């Protein structure tokens, strides 16, 4: 579908046992930007974790000089080395689905490597997501990912919760 602004929109319905997920990908024809939208129409309340928007980084962003920049509540961005092995998505126990992630309180993450950057952006007032990182090496290659968590669970979760829509953009500026 070509939108009025000239952008290209691709829409798909993904049927799951919990209900349909409507995924929309919009590619800008004016800038280096792709937007993704996830909607969960008619979903019942969910008791568990929900992770989506998995971004797998190319190997050129998996080197030791890759940096992650985001704000974790302060005025300025914090800078993290995206090196070594770690997996924020790994549950620490059977009662807790995750023990770590990024605050990214401004709804922005920048991934930098050798003068190149990828920017992820969302509106935290619309979607309270927690970005998680995964970096793992095997056979002289590295798997590097950013994953968004909409829900995590622990032993204090008593009631199921609604799943809201989530949208974010990927850009190079």
Where are these regions (language model features)?
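Beta-strand-rich recognition/accessory modules
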Residues: 1-24, 28-52, 89-173
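Short, solvent-exposed aromatic-acidic interface loops
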Residues: 41-43, 73-76
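Short intrinsically disordered coil segments
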Residues: 53-55, 71
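Short edge-strand/loop segments of extracellular domains
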Residues: 55-65
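Acidic/polar low-complexity flexible segments
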Residues: 63-71, 79
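Segments adjacent to and within acyl-thioester-processing domains across lipid
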Residues: 75-91
